[in-house]
């Protein structure tokens, strides 16, 4: 199993770090989550799935793999409407706090 974080989507809440501090960390100074391990040990699979399910912005993706099989994502790789909306909203933000409206 592998786990990846969509760092553009990460809300910097730190929920994943609170759930599994040895697997996730928040980088300085922006607080965006990072994965600390290349592959997840078998003993932590359930906890990683829990962390992914608890992410408030659904930025964590668990990639399951079976020996000899191609990797497959645990969730549909297509974005949900809510996730697409969050990405669109984040893409429209302009640094400095101005949202671009007149």
Swiss-Prot record:
Protein name in UniProt: Uncharacterized P450-system 3Fe-4S ferredoxin y4lB
Coiled coil: none
Pfam families in the record: Fer4_15
Protein task: Electron transport protein for the cytochrome systems.
Entry superkingdom: Bacteria
Gene Ontology molecular function terms on file: 3 iron, 4 sulfur cluster binding; electron transfer activity; iron ion binding
Gene3D superfamilies tied to this protein: 3.30.70.20
Cofactor(s) this protein requires: [3Fe-4S] cluster
Disordered as annotated region, ranges: 66-102
Bias kind Basic and acidic residues: ranges: 82-93
The record's free-text note on cofactor binding: Binds 1 [3Fe-4S] cluster.
Organism: Sinorhizobium fredii (strain NBRC 101917 / NGR234)
Presence of keyword Chloroplast: no
Residues given in the record as [3Fe-4S] cluster binding sites: 10, 16, 55
Keyword Thylakoid appears in the UniProt entry: no
SUPFAM superfamilies: 4Fe-4S ferredoxins
Keywords: 3Fe-4S, Electron transport, Iron, Iron-sulfur, Metal-binding, Plasmid, Transport
Family annotation (InterPro entries): 3Fe4S_ferredoxin, Fe-S_cluster_ET
